Amino acid sequence: MSIEVIRPGINTTFQDRGRSNLYHLGIPFSGAMDTRNLLITNKLVGNDKNDAVIEFALQGPKFKVKQNNINCVVTGNVSFTFKKNSKIYNGECYKTFDLNNNDEIDIISTNNSMYGYFSISGGFKIEKKWNSYSTHLRSKVGPNKGNKIVENDLLQLNKNLKPIIKKSIDYSNSKIEFIRVIKGTNFDYFSKESQKSFFESQYQVTNLTDRMGMRLDGNKLNNIKSENIKSEGLIKGVIQVPPDGKPIICLLYTSPSPRDETK
């Protein structure tokens, strides 16, 4: 029981809710970038909330099914089609659909968003690493030997013992209008002009953004503290400011190890 990867898409990996209990050992959290859509994905296909899903960024994967009676779902703001009995249908996010042997699903792209999710009833036959199905690419930890899903991979499936029940929900991925910021321990290390500029200026997300951090381009933040800065650990959501003065929002691959940049 498997599905074949015809096209891997961009940054396609297995993810779950992450490794929340190993941060003190220097192991990053990992996990799905959009936890809400992860949970919805598993709920719609009848899987446990801690089961793995496939996460993709921008362009999604294309799969060919190698067994009958698979119940699937795609979540996020995503365009996709599926080929069933040689006919192509436009897919609808947050609505399950069934596929049979040699049918295909083509997840074309996300729309005005970064990440999308795919799963099947019964889940994927993969092993946990450190009590999680999450993939951490930089350290090669997780299913698939810690690697991205690639062309010609055969993704093994668990046998689905539950009856297939078609489900759908009306769900809108709302646009965030405001981001709340709390002053950190290093806030007073920046000039008054930089503090004011940070809250009043616009910043552009750059193409250097990845699962470790969201890199921003905009007004430079000037650090006025000349002596060495005490190193502190990092967590998701911390805004780190390297020597070039361009902020980085720490995300799920953030290393808990101390850094010398201001926050």
Across the structure, where does each feature detected by a protein language model lie?
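Single conserved hydrophobic/aromatic residue that forms the stacking wall/gate
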Residues: Y253-K263
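Short active-site-adjacent structural elements
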Residues: F14, I248-C250, R259
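Acidic/His-leaning functional-site neighborhoods
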Residues: R211-G213, D217, I224-L252
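Structured core elements
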Residues: E4, K62-K64, N71-V73, D106, ...
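Conserved, well-structured core segments that form or line functional sites
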Residues: S79-F80, I88-N90, Y94-K225
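Intrinsically disordered, low-complexity, positively charged segments
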Residues: S2-S79, T185-N223
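Extended, compositionally biased flexible segments
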Residues: G31-K129, S255
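Residue-level "contact hotspot" at macromolecular interaction interfaces
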Residues: N37, D98, K148, Q240-V241
